[in-house]
Structures are given as C-alpha cells and as structure tokens.
C-alpha cells in the first residue's frame, strides 16, 4: 500500500508512455533518408526525443557546436526538433563545401523567420538559388560597386565611398566633441550607427538622413530587434508551435521588418518621382535604369516592384555589419590603450597631421589593418554564415548529405581553431603581420572567416572592409578613446545573427588635434 502511494504513475500509464516513446522513435527513424551503399551518415550525438539538441545548443550555439566538433569531427549532424542540421567546422572542410562543391551547398533552407524579411523576397535570405537569383545578385553587386568603390569623376576623393565616409567621419568627430562638452561620455554604438547609416543612405539614395529623422534613427538604433531573431538555430524555425505562443521577441522582429520595409518602400517611391535616366547618381537609380532596358523574359532584368528587395538587402547589411565592427573596434581600443597608441603612432608617421587619411593610405598602414583583422577574428561577431542548404544529394568527406539539408557553417570555430591560430583566445594584431612588421601576412589573413565563402559570399565584403578602415583611420587620427578609471568594459559577445558587446555608455574621446 505504501509503495503504491509513492509511485505517481500507474503501470498502465507507464506502458502507454513507453509505447508512445517507441512510436515516436521509430517514426523519426523512418523519416531519415536512406543512405546509399558504400556511404555513411555524418556522426550525430545523442539528442532528446522531439527536442533533439536544442537544449545542448543553449544560449551560445557557436560555442556548443565548436565543442561538439572537437569530439565528432568537421562534419556532424544535429537535430533541432525533428529537423536534421548539418554542422560544418574547420576551414578546409568549409572551403570544400562552399567553394569546390559550391553548387551543391549554395541553397538556403526554408526557414520561418526568413519569410518575414522583405515579405520572403530577400536576395540574401530567400530559398531561391537559380539563374534569376544569380542574375539579380550580379546586378546588385555591380550597382553596389559602381556607387561605392568605383571612382567619382566629379570629386577629388578616390571613390564615392571615400567621399561619403570622410564627410560622415568629420561630422561624427564634431558630434562626439559636443557630447564631451555636455554629458562628458557617450555610447559609441548609438553614435556610429547614425554615421554608417548615412553612408549607405548616400550610396543607395544619394542623400544623407537628417539627424531630426526620428523614423530612420529608430530603425538603425534598434537593429537588435532583427539580429536576435534572425540568428542561426532559433527554435522558431524548427518548432512551428512556438509561432502561435506569446513571444515578445517575435513580435518585435515582425514589427521591425514591417517598419523597415515600409520606410524603404516610401524612400524608393520618392526617389522614383525624381528619377532621371540621364543622371543616375546612386544604387537605386542604377536599378531603376536597369529595369527600363527591355523585356525581362531572360530573368536578367529586374521588375521595378522588386527593386526595394535588393535595396533592403544592401541597406540592411551595409549599416549593421559595419557599425558592429567599428563598435567592437572601439571597445577593444579602450581596453587595450597600448594598441591604440601603436595605431596612432603609425598614423602620425605615415599621414601626419595636415590631412585626413585616404583609402590609398591603406597599404602603408599595416598595423591598423592587422588590428581590424584581429577584431574580426577575435570577436567573430558573425559566428555563423546565414544557413545554407544542399541543392541536391551530395557527399562531403565521405558522408552522404541529402538534398534540402539545412547547413550551419561555424565561422567562430574557424577563427578560434588552435590548429590555425596560436593562442586563439589572445587578442594580438601582430599575428597578421609579416615577420618584419611592414605588411599583412596575406596567406594567414585569408584564413580569417567573417563574410562567408563561395556563391553566397557577402557582396558587400570589399565595401565593408574599406569603410571600416577609413572610419577608424580618421577617428583614431584625431581622437583618443578611453573609459574613466574603474569602469569595466564587458566584451562578452551577445549571441545573434551579428553578435554585439554589452552597451557601454561611459566611453570618452579626447581631441588629439583638429584638421580644417
């Protein structure tokens, strides 16, 4: 009698639960694709029924999957819910998949959160990877290059990007001086994001946004509402029931995407009212002109209604990635003043104090370039590429990978792989310099991974690197950044599509000298 009272379940209930467990197990096993003879499935750690490995991933999936790769290898499989996910680690394996077998791995999985971005029409996130997608990607790449890194015949600057960044960096220095004269401190992210958004706004629309534009400021200062939900491994993409439960983060994500799309639609429409095909001055204008060239049957031309989708991808990626990189750079500099002094010594020696840095100075500033590369590597603020998927049945390192398999590419693991990097947890820009310290060690720099690889490599990679370099060169030439004694700076990354550091509102900037 006492024993029966201590057991909360009856024998019948236990048998029923066991039967259900076995049924679920066999159903899930039956859903697994048949592996062709002579091949094998990737190794898979034990996971919970129905849940898979979602609990194992925790709050930092990039770290959890890096630990798994140490035990199970470069190619492993996990399950999030009932969905199999291939996880790729280590540089050689990732390069084999995304470059040498690029056509096999160029797809995107059909994820719920991706359908909420630009109404599911995003060039970056959509599942499309066919000829029309490839043609539009080339079009976006060409338009971006034309109004960023190409030369501007009407300007003394080397290119449009240099002109826009120089103007915005000068305005940012003035704004930081005003803040130092007032409150005496500032949050660098909130200040940098406005300047970076103005640069991409000038390239996309030929205009800078006024500081009084509350609409624009609200969007660019709240990108965390996007990156926290668009991250790899979000349970929303793998457990459909979660979409119908109260979820403040999902509601913020939906609202942000709707506001952002509406803002861009309105801006593009206003731009169209003034469009002159004989005077194309920005990316949107170039897309308008291309849309009017003739029939679209080949897929090489883009309908006007699709232009906003391309602009959304270019604008969105153009300010978040660059802002995050510059913000991380400033956080490293205030915690490592000796590195800041080395950069400023290099700037003083190469450029002096009579003019501002230019993009042409980049080869003569190897230590600054090494610092930027080390910031990319150490923070790995893009821990995963946007998820890939396989476009057909394929093999990788002897493992069978079925068509439409979701693929996570762990960039953080590559950037912290002890086989590639000596003391990977240490922040040391010198690792990227040649032995004599006069140039970048190019073979090593090419092992750092932040912008993806292959057919889905970020189209704005060159633009981002040039922009980050020029912003930092101009800022560090004229300003010295610090935090007051006793203020602790938290450099722990906060997981998301792009990982941010904890906000720091106590950064200070002292003017070294001014340039008219």
Swiss-Prot record:
Induction: By nicotine, omeprazole, phenobarbital, primidone and rifampicin.
Provenance organism: Homo sapiens
Phenotype for residue 168 to Q: In allele CYP1A2*10
Protein name in UniProt: Cytochrome P450 1A2
Resulting phenotype, residue 21 to L: In allele CYP1A2*2
Tissue: Liver.
Reaction equation(s) it catalyzes: an organic molecule + reduced [NADPH--hemoprotein reductase] + O2 = an alcohol + oxidized [NADPH--hemoprotein reductase] + H2O + H(+); 17beta-estradiol + reduced [NADPH--hemoprotein reductase] + O2 = 2-hydroxy-17beta-estradiol + oxidized [NADPH--hemoprotein reductase] + H2O + H(+); 17beta-estradiol + reduced [NADPH--hemoprotein reductase] + O2 = 4-hydroxy-17beta-estradiol + oxidized [NADPH--hemoprotein reductase] + H2O + H(+); estrone + reduced [NADPH--hemoprotein reductase] + O2 = 2-hydroxyestrone + oxidized [NADPH--hemoprotein reductase] + H2O + H(+)
Needed co-factor(s): heme
